[in-house]
């Protein structure tokens, strides 16, 4: 016989915490939050204390490809998010405004429209672009948000335009605010351990303070082992909430072919120094130019290989690339790379997102 609904709320919080901590799928934990208020409190606490393996967002996904990924990755597509056929909603934005959504609950938050950017106004006035052009769809290169958009004080930081400048908005803002303290083109941004960071093409790291009255980007430290390195740089979150800088290097081998390799540096907040990470130690690292860059414990997170880097490679449509992207895995110990997936569509976008707030 089914238990009365009231009895579900009478389970001890300690018991609920134990049960929820043993759930490995974020969707299961979020579904538990809908049972009653006590379950919501316990499941929310567990949910935000955990690091979940990311979803793979694919902008153009066929049903056959989705079946292929069913035993490897959790896959998201615009159709699953309710945006299929919506010409005003794109992966990074639209002329009418941005959206932020959770991939499980599909909740949506409105953000300031692209037209509030002066660069967009100039392009439209000069007729250099039209509202539905590919250039406008890819105007925002990357977006990251503070921990939860359920918070009244949430903030969103973006990299925008071809010169890769920074702008941000706070809850209720009608337009984007430029952050003009960064001298060089920005390679990547991240929200890590309660702080926004940016890294420019020269390898300078900035702490981005996005206050309403005095927003600024302050250099994090004067020296770094990757300063002036011309390779692609990512800002990533370690599985214990420390800041990582990941260098993606292309080097010529003995056969005069280019080989991809990675270097990782961890920032010590107490000494303001960088330490080279020599091993992923059972972790899997996920990298993508547009999406989340994060390390998780591979053994607890499904079918991912440990000591491996899962990265999106190839031409990035957001920076004018016209070729296909592909998903590959770099095995840390052997230094071997295996291509996992290449989409059929030449303009397909792929990136990693986590089961928290997803920039759209």
From Swiss-Prot:
Pfam families: Beta-prop_KIB1-4, F-box-like
Disulfide feature: none
Cross-referenced InterPro entries: F-box-like_dom_sf, F-box_BR-signaling, F-box_dom, KIB1-4_b-propeller, Quino_amine_DH_bsu
SUPFAM superfamilies: F-box domain, YVTN repeat-like/Quinoprotein amine dehydrogenase
Signal peptide: none
The F-box domain, residue ranges: 6-54
Identification of the protein by name: Putative F-box protein At5g55150
Species per Swiss-Prot/TrEMBL record: Arabidopsis thaliana
């Amino acid at each position: 016989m089914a238990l009365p609904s009231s009895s579900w709320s009478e389970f001890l919080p300690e018991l609920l915490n134990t049960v929820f901590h043993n759930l490995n799928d974020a969707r299961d934990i979020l579904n538990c939050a809908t049972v009653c208020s006590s379950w919501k409190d316990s499941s929310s606490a567990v949910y935000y204390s955990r690091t979940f393996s990311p979803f793979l967002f694919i902008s153009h996904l066929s049903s056959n490809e989705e079946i292929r990924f069913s035993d490897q990755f959790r896959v998201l597509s615009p159709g699953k998010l309710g945006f299929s056929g919506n010409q005003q909603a794109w992966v990074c934005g639209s002329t009418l405004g941005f959206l932020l959504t959770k991939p499980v609950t599909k909740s949506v938050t409105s953000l300031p429209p692209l037209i509030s950017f002066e660069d967009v106004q100039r392009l439209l006035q000069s007729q250099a672009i039209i509202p539905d052009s590919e250039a406008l769809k890819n105007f925002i290169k990357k977006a990251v948000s503070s921990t939860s958009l359920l918070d009244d004080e949430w903030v969103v930081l973006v990299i925008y335009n071809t010169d890769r400048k920074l702008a941000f908005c706070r809850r209720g803002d009608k337009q984007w605010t430029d952050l003009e303290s960064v001298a060089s083109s920005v390679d990547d941004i991240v929200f890590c351990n309660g702080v926004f960071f940016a890294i420019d093409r020269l390898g300078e790291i900035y702490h981005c303070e996005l206050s309403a009255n005095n927003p600024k980007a302050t250099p994090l430290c004067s020296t770094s082992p990757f300063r002036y390195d011309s390779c692609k740089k990512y800002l990533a979150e370690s599985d214990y909430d420390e800041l990582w800088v990941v260098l993606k290097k292309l080097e010529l081998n003995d056969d005069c072919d280019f080989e991809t390799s990675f270097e990782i540096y961890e920032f010590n907040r107490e000494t303001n120094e960088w330490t080279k990470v020599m091993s992923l130690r059972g972790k899997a690292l996920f990298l993508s130019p547009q999406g989340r860059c994060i390390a998780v414990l591979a053994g607890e997170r499904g079918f991912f290989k440990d000591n491996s880097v899962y990265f999106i490679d190839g031409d990035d449509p957001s920076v004018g690339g016209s070729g296909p992207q592909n998903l590959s895995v770099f095995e840390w110990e052997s230094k071997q790379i295996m291509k996992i997936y290449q989409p059929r569509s030449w303009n397909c976008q792929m990136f990693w997102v986590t089961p928290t707030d997803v920039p759209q």
